[in-house]
Each structure stands twice: as C-alpha cells, then as structure tokens.
Amino acid sequence: MAPGEKIKAKIKKNLPVKGPQAPTIKELMRWYCLNTNTHGCRRIVVSPGRLRRLLWIAFTLTAVGLIFWQCALLVFSFYTVSVSIKVHFQKLDFPAVTICNINPYKYSVVRDLLADLEQETRGALKSLYGFSEVKSRKQRDTESWSPAWEGVRPKFLNLVPLLIFNRDEKGKARDFLSLGRKRKISGNIIHKASNVVQVHESKKVVGFQLCPNDSSDCATYTFSSGINAIQEWYKLHYMNIMAQVPLEKKINMSYSAEELLVTCFFDGMSCDARNFTLFHHPMYGNCYTFNNRENETILSTSMGGSEYGLQVILYINEEEYNPFLVSATGAKVLIHRQDEYPFIEDVGTEIETAMSTSIGMHLTESFKLSEPYSQCTEDGSDVPIKNIYNAAYSLQICLYSCFQTKMVEKCGCAQYSQPLPPAANYCNYQQHPNWMYCYYQLYQAFVQEELGCQSVCKQSCSFKEWALTTSLAQWPSAVSEKWLLPVLTWDQGQQINKKLNKTDWAKLLIFYKDLNQRSIMESPANSIEMLLSNFGGQLGLWMSCSVVCVIEIIEVFFIDSLSIVTRRQWQKAKEWWARRKAAPSAEAPSGAQGQENPALEIDDDLPTFTSALSLPPAPGAQVPGTPPPRYNTLRLERTFSQQLADTRLPDEP
C-alpha cells in the first residue's frame, strides 16, 4: 500500500463516527461495540491480537446462547397448561433384628465344665451367708458343700478369694477359707459403687481380691450387694473356662434356631429358621439375626402396624438356665443396621416370658458434615485404631477395639467378651495367670479415660437410629392357655419331653409405627456457590460488574500488566547489555594527572606574562564533516492537502 493510502486509512480509522451516521454496517457495529455497556462486545473490538478477539467472540456467543436457552425455557414453562401427577408408594427397609436367649448355653450340656466352679460357689454362699441352696430341680444333681473340703484349698477360691468386710474394721476381712478368722488385707480396696446414685450402705460388704503373680500389690474390689459380688466373681471364672472351649463345641452347646424360634411371620407371610443367620456371641451364645442382607437382599415393608412387621414366638426353656450366671429369664433383642455389629449386651432390649412384647419403631437418619465442620469420620479410615470387628465403623466399635488392643499389649491376651485381634489368644489361667488383675486395672483406667481411647475415637458422620416404643400384654391369656400351650408343645415335636408352662414362652412383635422417616442433615451455612453469589451481587450492585467483567479485569491487570512489565524489563536488560559491549575498555593512567606534562611545569613563584606565553594554544573548533539537512524537504503541507482532497464526506440529506 502506498504511503498516502496508509495515512488515509489511519485517519479514517480514527475518525469519530456516531451511530446512525456510520457509512457501513461494519462501522455501525464497531461503534456499538465501543460504546455499549455489554463488556464482551467491547472486548471483541479493543482486544489486541487475533487469538484474544476469537476467545472473546466465543465467550460472548456462548453467553448469548445460554441467555436465549434459559429465556425460551421460561417462556415455554409460562405458557404450558399441562399438569403432572406423581404417585409414590413409600417403602422402608426393614432393619436387621438379632435375638438371643439370655442364658447362653444349655445347663444340662455345660454343667460338666462348670461343676467345680458351681460347687465352690455353693460352698462360698454357705460360708459367707450361712445358708444352703434349696434344690427345686431334679435335673441338678450337684454336690452340696461337705466337710470334705476342710483342709483343702479349692482352686477357684484360692485364685480369687471371696471376702466379707466390716465397715467398722478397716483393713480387715473375713475369709471363709480361714475358717471364719479375720485377716489383714493389703493393697488397695476399691468399692465398685455408683458415684451418682446414693444407696443405703450396709455394715458389711462382699468382695474379692486380685493379686498379680508373685507380688503382694493386691487390689480388693468390694460391692454394695452380695449378689453383684458373687455374680462378678463367678463371671470371671466362667470366662476363663469358656475361653478354652473350641467355637464349634460352644455352638453345639447353645440353642439351635429350631429350638429358639417356634413360629415366624413377616409382613403377613410365613417364615422359619432358614430366614435367620447364626451369630455366636461370647456371653449370649447362639444368637440369630433376621434380615441380615442374606443373598444381598434387604427386606422392606410398605405398611405400618403390627400386622406388617416381624412376629416370632420364642421358646425360652427356663429349666436349662444357669443359676449363677444369669438371674433373669427371657430373651434379648437388638434392632440395628445390616452392616452393624450387634452389641446385644450394651443396648439390647429384654423380652419377658409369659408376655407379648410389641416394639414400635420410628426411623431417624442423621447425616453430619465431616471436617472442618465437625470431628466425625466417614468410615473410620482416619482413626488410628484398627477395627477388629467384621462390621462397619461406629464409635462403640472403635472404643472396644482400642481397649482390646491395649489389653493385648498390657496383659498379653485378649478379653473373652470381645473379638480376637490378629495373632492373639483369649486369656486363661494356664497361659496367663495374671490376666484378671491386669484386666481390672486396665478396665478401671479405660472407664476413667486414662487410656486415650475416648480422645482418639470419633463419632460416625452418618448413622441410623430406631426410636423404640415398647408395650406389654399378658400372653397367653388364662382362657387361651389351655389350648395354646399344647399346640406349641406339639409344634416343637420330639424336642420337648415335658409339660410346658407359660414362663417357657415369649412372644415378640417388631414393626414400624408409620412409614414417616425423619432425616437430620447438616449443610454448610456458607458454601462456594453462596460465596460466589454474594460476590456477584456486590460487584453487580456497586460496579455493574459481571463474570465478563471479572475476566476482563484478569486480562488487563494480570496478563497485560505482567506482559508490559516483562517487556520493559527485557528491554532494559538488552540496553544494559548493549552499553556494556559498546563501552571502551579504558586503562587507568600510570601516574598522577599532569605531572609529566611539560606545559604544566610552573615555578614556585607567581605566574608572569612570560610563563603564560609559553602555554600551548587552544585547539580550534572542528568543522562537522556532514552538512545539515535541507529543512524544506520536511514540509508536508502540500502533500497532506492533496491527500485530504481525495477524501470525500457523504452529502448531508
């Protein structure tokens, strides 16, 4: 393009064109983009470089397309006259139900293993309280306390002596093994009573003494009730004996599903023992879980009420109860999730015999936010305690796993009532003679939160709870007992060879009271979406700024500014390098300046006219070799006038 044409095009480009006065559509659009409040259109024109202009065109067209799409949806929705009807039949998943007999093992089967322990227990009762148990069952043909024990120290009472303390005589106790003589008690005396509930204190208390192996540092545990002391002492030895029995043998000694579950109905349909899964509990024997996600299916119910839940009749068999291990008759039931471990001993509900127990459920689901909103955990993976249970994480599982791990570390064996950690064995006298003392000391530290388990374990973020409402009714009634008990006996077939009474049976009904499910969900008060929305509202209110404006700010203040600073620094670096290369390498003079110049040699006297004449003459001015330019060639008035003559403005109408 000729120089004149270039100047002409530049002048046209910079002419102030106003809206409708633009000569072409292109110039009109350009004027609109330069003067509109729509930021995207303006950036299309003023952005330098083809790539940036293409990006702004893409952003603007995308935004315009979204606007048309959303507006079209709003218009169509406004003029739509159709009606939508939703019919939803709600169903709730039925929880898992675990049922256990309170008595873990049939007494007729386990009696041989516990014969010596029971004999010493009866002898201790006779010596401590001065009475003998009245035999009321022909099946229990055990030996009573006899003088043959005199002079012989029994095994169980020798390991853990039973003592009677008189509150008036501190530090002394009566041991029946010493023929009633009082002896001094060394070590700590710990009274296991509640610090909250005040009970009447009797003058005499019963307890037992635990001593570490080959040590006199003993601990004596006393109880406000002799019943608690005898049962706790019996339970310690019972766990020691059963810990040495293989699991298969213990399963055979407990109740089978056919023996415990007589009849079963769910949601109006018949069920049987095949719908229950065996779960062996160390302290409750064989337990059976209904709806335990067998075959990866979970049963659900679509109606509320007792007719649409689980109905079972349980055979308790009171005749087979261990008299010292349990003092109540009935069963225990626990409602829980399918992947949850049933802590039947802690939160189970007891079922009475000769009663119909109805349990109405109401489901509540809770969902909590994890960190940073709370200290809960999703699945326990962030808790430094290994889950020794084959179940989903819960706070209770974490606490018991922590205690069992500490038990193995401190005592060298595992406590019988909890699962075994890897490469560990249950405690027993033969291999771990010191385990009882260690267990009680460790459990006391656990209750007082000295082991650190309570500070490490976290609550689960999501869990289900069933609020239970229990009601009781006498069952069977006096008029129906005459025919109902014979029918139940006939249903049991050859398994029962005696006449049953109502205390051998219990009826259980578990159902949803209604299908209303309550959900408790936590949500953050300030989310990312809300934060961006608040920012957008403030920017739009005070600066009429949008997302396009934010992109424009990023482009100008970050990309362009950084580019300019980088360019300037690069230019300065190039100039510095050029000056360094062009500068002559001047050498420093060898002596003082002017000392070797003969023209500067002066006398010590004042200067005279003669000495001034001896100075060299000043050099003459140099004449430039290049003549000055002809300034008349720089005058552009004539050329500029000729170029403006070729530019014509449109005629006014």
UniProtKB/Swiss-Prot annotation:
The lineage of its organism: Eukaryota, Metazoa, Chordata, Craniata, Vertebrata. This is one of the three pore-forming subunits of the heterotrimeric epithelial sodium channel (ENaC), a critical regulator of sodium balance and fluid homeostasis. ENaC operates in epithelial tissues, where it mediates the electrodiffusion of sodium ions from extracellular fluid through the apical membrane of cells, with water following osmotically. It plays a key role in maintaining sodium homeostasis through electrogenic sodium reabsorption in the kidneys. Additionally, ENaC is essential for airway surface liquid homeostasis, which is crucial for proper mucus clearance. Keywords: Cell membrane, Disulfide bond, Glycoprotein, Ion channel, Ion transport, Membrane, Phosphoprotein, Sodium, Sodium channel, Sodium transport, Transmembrane, Transmembrane helix, Transport, Ubl conjugation. The chain crosses the membrane at residues 56-76, 539-559. The record marks 140-141, 184-185 as: Cleavage. It comes from Oryctolagus cuniculus (Rabbit). The gene is SCNN1G. This is Epithelial sodium channel subunit gamma. The keyword Ion transport applies. Coiled coil: none annotated. GO terms for cellular component: apical plasma membrane; plasma membrane; sodium channel complex. Component of the heterotrimeric epithelial sodium channel (ENaC) composed of an alpha/SCNN1A, a beta/SCNN1B and a gamma/SCNN1G subunit. Interacts with WWP1 (via WW domains). Interacts with WWP2 (via WW domains); inhibits the channel. Interacts with the full-length immature form of PCSK9 (pro-PCSK9); inhibits ENaC by promoting its proteasomal degradation. Interacts with BPIFA1; the interaction is indirect via SCNN1B and inhibits the proteolytic maturation of SCNN1A and SCNN1G and the activation of ENaC. The keyword Metal-binding does not apply.
